[in-house]
């Protein structure tokens, strides 16, 4: 009688250890799935920098705009990586021709701030060192 009980306990203990060591649901990456992106990840930061650069190239405003905050950042692994960003950008006091634009202060006066909420999709092929803007949409905040 003791052997079946010991065997059952051993099986239960083995299963508990196996479950504890298996990847959690949130740790599994499924190709094509969309997941929250880690804002501290160097690749995500590079994609955000690319977004702001492309955004400033496309605007006719003489003033540089920079990131105020990230509302949402997601990524999707496909034949490369799709990044989806929802961000808020603000107008700085620097013109686009000035150096060190990443540290420019934002306009203080409300009529000059011209904040915008934007959504961007970026496609990156890391092994080809290629990044492209797929989709962008902005509206006044």
From Swiss-Prot:
Q: Where is this site: Reactive site?
A: 32
Where does it live in the cell? Secreted
Q: Does the keyword Disulfide bond apply?
A: yes
The GO molecular function terms of this record are: cysteine-type endopeptidase inhibitor activity
Q: What tissue specificity is annotated for this entry?
A: Expressed in submandibular and sublingual saliva but not in parotid saliva (at protein level). Expressed in submandibular gland and parotid gland.
Q: Which residues form the signal peptide?
A: 1-20
Classify the main location.
secreted
Disulfide pairs here are 94-104, 118-138
Chain positions of motif Secondary area of contact: 76-80
Report the domain of life of the source organism.
Eukaryota
Q: Which PANTHER family has this protein been placed in?
A: CYSTATIN, CYSTATIN-S-RELATED
Q: What does this protein do?
A: Thiol protease inhibitor.
Q: What is this protein called?
A: Cystatin-SA
Task: State the organism named in the record.
Answer: Homo sapiens
Gene name of the record = CST2
